[in-house]
Amino acid sequence: MKTFHVIVLTSIFAVAGCSGDKVNLSDLKPAASKSVGKLTIVLLNKSGELMQGQNEFVVQFKDDQGQPADVGDVQIGSSMSMPSMAPMSGDSELTPTGQAGIYKVTSNFAMSGAWHFTLSWNGPYGQGHTTFNSNVR
């Protein structure tokens, strides 16, 4: 299990349908999706929305055929801009599930509002990164 400092991705999605490390994706709704090269990255949780407070969510990587993509080592970070202040930052815990291309994240959003988070990876699909901008309710 790896812990990554996040520039505040603290609490994204409440994941239902996870038993142990195994994730049942059919119980989850997409909250955000982005294509990067030949990869599609989908963030999933039970409601499909980001909420203030403690949350769990799933990050899924898929190849250009829609199949699970093992991208190797994945890191996550998040931040929330604060007027006249330094951005909020915090920690998130990212855990591989043992299922190709599927990772669980436990995080806590301290406040509602506009959050920015980054995912980076290094492995069979090379090195890459992307940024998601999400509204936490």
Language-model regions, residue ranges each:
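Contiguous segments within soluble domain cores/interaction surfaces
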Residues: 19-112, 116, 120-137
